[in-house]
């Protein structure tokens, strides 16, 4: 490798003095426009550091000479938005559920607000489309454990189910096997009887009369003589082919043996009353509201 520079005979540009396998490196200067632009960006960066928030400090950050804050801009925009919505939200806060249903504009506002709140607070369990999952009800159908009227939905949202709230909805599926109320063979029989109520196939040799007898003695108090359930205690309809935990025999045996006691949180105290009202309207509008 050479230790001195020379001028390239073709380009007239000096070399760096380096050569690799006969290939020499030209010392071509940067274009003047590029150098000027580079220096301008340095000056611009220094100016930006001075006039805008830029450098973090131990407790905050430098504020800059302009005192600009994008968060402050957002706060102003949100305040303006709240001002625009203020009258409508105030009307929504004082309106009854029946009044909201009668007013198309108020109904649209409640649905829009309720949809947003649902996505933030309810979708984790019920799904973004409110179709539910195992143990979490589908809110699009017309099957309601605790009633599907606007008032009933609002009450469920306010106080929850087995949530610990003083006004929570109480009621649970008893553990007939775990408590020793029914024997394993009886549980299998009544599980098949429950399947038959929805037209599902039953185990070969299943005794329908015995299943009906066990059901009448142990289940009618909550689910009713016709097995159509009771929203007063959260007992589901067993004849509509809608299943919260599953309709297969093994799942029904598990349910009857160990019971079910799902929990829904109470939203009173977490969300303001107007927001809960809007969420009730939204859930009611999903298609299954009564």
From Swiss-Prot:
Keyword Transmembrane helix: yes
Cofactor: how bound: Binds 2 heme C groups per subunit.
Cytochrome c domain span: 109-198, 206-287
UniProt superkingdom: Bacteria
Record-listed heme c 2 binding positions: 173, 219, 222-223
Pathway it works in: Energy metabolism; oxidative phosphorylation
PROSITE patterns: CYTC
Localization in the cell: Cell inner membrane
Needed co-factor(s): heme c
Cellular component GO terms, alphabetical: plasma membrane
GO MF annotations in UniProt: electron transfer activity; heme binding; iron ion binding; oxidoreductase activity
UniProt topology in membrane: Single-pass membrane protein
Entry keyword set: Cell inner membrane, Cell membrane, Electron transport, Heme, Hydrogen ion transport, Ion transport, Iron, Membrane, Metal-binding, Oxidoreductase, Repeat, Respiratory chain, Transmembrane, Transmembrane helix, Transport
Membrane spanning stretches: 33-53
Main location class: membrane
GO biological process annotation, one example: proton transmembrane transport
Residues reported in the UniProt entry to bind heme c 1: 122, 125-126, 264
PANTHER family membership: CBB3-TYPE CYTOCHROME C OXIDASE SUBUNIT FIXP
Role this protein plays: C-type cytochrome. Part of the cbb3-type cytochrome c oxidase complex. FixP subunit is required for transferring electrons from donor cytochrome c via its heme groups to FixO subunit. From there, electrons are shuttled to the catalytic binuclear center of FixN subunit where oxygen reduction takes place. The complex also functions as a proton pump.
Subunit and interaction comment: Component of the cbb3-type cytochrome c oxidase at least composed of FixN, FixO, FixQ and FixP.
Family of the protein in this entry: Belongs to the CcoP / FixP family.
Name the record gives this protein: Cbb3-type cytochrome c oxidase subunit FixP
Native source species: Bradyrhizobium sp. (strain ORS 278)
Organism taxonomic ancestry: Bacteria, Pseudomonadati, Pseudomonadota, Alphaproteobacteria, Hyphomicrobiales
């Amino acid at each position: 490798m050479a230790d001195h520079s020379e001028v390239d005979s073709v380009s007239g540009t000096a070399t760096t003095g380096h050569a690799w396998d006969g290939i020499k490196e030209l010392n071509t200067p940067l274009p003047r426009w590029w150098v000027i632009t580079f220096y301008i960006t340095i000056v611009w960066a220094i100016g930006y550091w001075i006039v805008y928030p830029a450098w973090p400090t131990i407790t905050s950050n430098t504020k800059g000479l302009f005192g600009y804050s994008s968060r402050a801009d957002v706060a102003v925009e949100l305040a303006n938005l709240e001002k625009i919505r203020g009258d409508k939200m105030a009307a929504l806060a004082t309106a009854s559920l029946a009044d909201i249903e009668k007013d198309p504009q108020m109904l649209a506002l409640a649905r829009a607000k309720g949809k947003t709140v649902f996505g933030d607070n309810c979708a984790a369990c019920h799904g973004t489309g409110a179709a539910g999952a195992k143990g979490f009800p589908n809110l699009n159908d017309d099957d309601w454990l605790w009633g599907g009227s606007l008032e009933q939905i609002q009450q469920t949202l306010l106080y929850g189910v087995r949530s610990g709230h003083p006004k929570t909805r109480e009621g649970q599926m008893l553990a007939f096997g775990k408590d020793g109320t029914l024997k394993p063979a009886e549980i299998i029989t009544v599980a098949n009887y429950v399947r038959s109520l929805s037209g599902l196939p039953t185990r070969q040799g299943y005794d329908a009369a015995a299943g009906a007898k066990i059901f009448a003695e142990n289940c009618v108090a909550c689910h009713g003589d016709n097995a159509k359930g009771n929203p007063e205690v959260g007992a589901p309809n067993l004849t509509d082919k809608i299943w919260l935990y599953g309709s297969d025999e093994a799942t029904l045996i598990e349910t009857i043996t160990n019971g079910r006691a799902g929990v829904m949180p109470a939203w009173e105290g977490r969300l303001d009353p107007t927001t809960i009202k809007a969420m009730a309207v939204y859930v009611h509008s999903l298609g299954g509201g009564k």
